[in-house]
């Protein structure tokens, strides 16, 4: 098995961006553990972790967007603009659903989940459309992204309905699930 075979600059951007997103999830998870543990003062480490999550997340989006944009010029698959429009439409549908139907305060996590899902699906689409991923790998990764996004949305909707301890654990589920999906994505891309 050969890793990183014929990697071009756009492939490295997508790989590095996903790696940074994995680090972002881990920093965010560390912040969550430190800041929201029941009966805990939080401590000063929380500020470091959330800052690191923000920086790695923004850098990841920039890198992945560059790689996706470059590859989309040659992609014969689903155009990325349809994925982005679908993600934006879903976000704007879920804003009132979240507030009106579920009576849940809208927080930045709703936007973060949509950005993550659209970014990952866009990467899968261009990697499939350029022939880097076969249909099996593309469908598997897209399904994992979909499952992780739906799990995150369910946890998001339930968060304020749970007691302190349950909501603490509930908040870790999307971060852990997304980190797992990104680790799988990195492994699949490395050997493709």
Each predicted region: which residue ranges?
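N-terminal topogenic module of multi-pass integral membrane proteins
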Residues: 1-77
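Non-cytosolic membrane-interface motifs at loop->transmembrane helix junctions
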Residues: 42-47, 106-112, 137-139, 166-173
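Structural signature of hydrophobic alpha-helical transmembrane segments
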Residues: 50-56, 82-86, 140-147
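C-terminal ends of transmembrane helices
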Residues: 64-72, 97-104, 157-163
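Membrane-proximal helix-loop-helix units in multi-pass membrane proteins
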Residues: 89-147
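Membrane-helix boundary connector in multi-pass membrane proteins
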Residues: 129-139, 151-170
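Small-residue-rich transmembrane alpha-helices that serve as helix-helix interface/gating elements
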Residues: 171-183
């Amino acid at each position: 098995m050969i890793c990183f075979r014929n990697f071009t600059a756009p492939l490295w951007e997508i790989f590095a961006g996903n790696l940074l997103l994995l680090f972002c999830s881990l920093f965010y998870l560390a912040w969550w553990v430190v800041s929201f543990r029941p009966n805990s003062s939080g401590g000063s480490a929380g500020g470091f972790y959330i800052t690191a999550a923000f920086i790695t997340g923004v850098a990841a989006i920039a890198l992945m967007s560059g790689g996706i944009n470059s590859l989309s010029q040659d992609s014969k698959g689903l155009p990325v603009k349809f994925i982005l429009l679908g993600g934006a439409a879903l976000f704007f549908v879920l804003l009132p659903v979240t507030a009106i139907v579920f009576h849940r305060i809208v927080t930045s996590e709703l936007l973060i989940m949509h950005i993550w899902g659209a970014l990952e699906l866009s990467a899968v689409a261009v990697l499939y459309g350029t022939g880097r991923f076969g249909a099996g790998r593309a469908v598997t990764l897209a399904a994992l992204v979909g499952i992780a996004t739906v799990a995150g949305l369910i946890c998001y909707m339930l968060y304020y309905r749970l007691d302190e301890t349950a909501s603490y654990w509930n908040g870790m589920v999307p971060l852990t699930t997304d980190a797992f999906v990104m680790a799988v994505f990195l492994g699949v891309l490395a050997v493709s």
